[in-house]
Amino acid sequence: GFIISIIMSIFTLVFGEIYMGMIGGAVLDMDILLKLFGVIVLSAFASSAIASFIISFLKTNSAYSAASMIVGTLIGFLVGAYIPIGNLPENVQWLVKYFPCAHSAVLYRQLLMKGSIKENFANQPTAVLKETKEILGVVFVYNGHTASAWMSVVALLITGVVFYLLAVLV
């Protein structure tokens, strides 16, 4: 799952960049692309570790199919794919901020939205930019402190190591 996830993500990124270039849209700098590659590998590591752990409990194809459907839908909500994180109730926002896959989404958003946020909020007060980033899940704020990208990287590394160890031990 780890290798396939990386291949599919890189494939999507490359073709997305080709498409954006063909229609005259903004194309990402090489610096951002290299960082995205790192996030892809890190995300695949953490996600495949969690999947390995969950799969270690499933014994039939039907159990796997049911778990995949439920987990896949739940993950969409918990990473802010369906509804912006800031529009969720406070207790759900708290849960999202401690969900490992949401840290992947934060890192992707920070890299992919960096240029457009800077450009679109250039004439806005800092408070508006800060609030927008929180609502859209570009940053996570814990007790009034904005988490750095490195906190998300560490969260994903720890998640990957812990869940791979648990999958092996189960």
Please give the residue ranges for each predicted region.
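Alpha-helical transmembrane segments of multi-pass membrane transporters/translocases
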Residues: K114-V170
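Transmembrane helix segments
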Residues: L58-S116
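Alpha-helical transmembrane segments and their short interhelical loops
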Residues: F2-I75, L165
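Membrane-interface helix-boundary signature
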Residues: I32, N61-S62, V92, H145-S152
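Short alpha-helix boundary/capping motifs
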Residues: I10, Y82-I83, V106, N123, ...
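Short alpha-helical linear motifs
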Residues: G16-I23, P89-W94, K114-N123
